[in-house]
């Protein structure tokens, strides 16, 4: 292939990939298979967009979902409730780990 043909082929591949991966209006897939270039994760048997939802207790929930932990409110997608100490920790921290500046101590509700 001539150098000019290579340039045209590379340009065509670039244009097609940009078209397939463009972030236009969202389109719901007609099949259970994922569309190319869409960031999706799985929660049980359902797929979800991690930019809008998370998987909490085997259910797809919005990122803004909150629950109570004692007298505190925590964001289930980013924090967790340690019920035996009524402490809210970041989701990736172990409830048994030492207290950090990110932790919130909550009182139990009687």
From Swiss-Prot:
Glycans are attached at residue 71. Detected in ovary and spinal cord. InterPro entries: IGFL (IPR032744). Coiled coil: none annotated. Residues 1-24 form the signal peptide. GO terms for cellular component: extracellular space. It comes from the Eukaryota. Keywords: Disulfide bond, Glycoprotein, Secreted, Signal. GO terms for molecular function: signaling receptor binding. It is found in: Secreted. Pfam families: IGFL (PF14653). Probable ligand of the IGFLR1 cell membrane receptor. Homodimer; disulfide-linked. Belongs to the IGFL family. This is Insulin growth factor-like family member 1. It comes from Homo sapiens.
């Amino acid at each position: 292939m001539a150098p000019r043909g290579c340039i045209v082929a590379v340009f065509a591949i670039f244009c097609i990939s940009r078209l397939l991966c463009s972030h236009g209006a969202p389109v719901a897939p007609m099949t259970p298979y994922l569309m190319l270039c869409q960031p999706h994760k799985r929660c049980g048997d359902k797929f979800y967009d991690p930019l809008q939802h998370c998987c909490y207790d085997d259910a797809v929930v919005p990122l803004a979902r909150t629950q109570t932990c004692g007298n505190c409110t925590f964001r289930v997608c980013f924090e967790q409730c340690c019920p035996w100490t009524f402490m809210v920790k970041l989701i990736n921290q172990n409830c048994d780990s030492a207290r950090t500046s990110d932790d919130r101590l909550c009182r139990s509700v009687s």
